UniProtKB/Swiss-Prot annotation:
PROSITE patterns (alphabetical): RIBOSOMAL_L17
Keywords: Ribonucleoprotein, Ribosomal protein
GO biological process, one term: translation
Family according to the record: Belongs to the bacterial ribosomal protein bL17 family.
Subunit structure: Part of the 50S ribosomal subunit. Contacts protein L32.
Protein name according to UniProt: Large ribosomal subunit protein bL17
InterPro entries: Ribosomal_bL17, Ribosomal_bL17_CS, Ribosomal_bL17_sf
Organism of provenance: Ureaplasma parvum serovar 3 (strain ATCC 700970)
Amino acid sequence: MSYINKPGKTRAWRKMVSRQQVSDVISHGSIVTTKTKAKESQRHVDHLITLAKKNTLASRRAAAAILLGTNQHSADDLLRKLFNELGPKYANRAGGYTRVIKLGNRPGDNTEEAVLQLV
């Protein structure tokens, strides 16, 4: 789950940030983040929705290993939402469950920002 080779950041940090962003997208439907993190998290969200479409015990366990609880929802709530709402919603779609929309640069450090949202 690492998205860039960022000096000063460990693999564990990159993995946790990616897992948290994936959980936030499933919880809220969209997030605002940097373009690089959005592109990487997009891969993982699309993969989780593909697992939700399969709806097997193995796919539920694989998704549970990735999802983290947020302030509003527990990991179990997110798993239910993924398999009961998002899986059936995208059942007839072959892929491309999310989109990244560029927002421009952040005022503080001039980093490109983007919105990662479910289609």
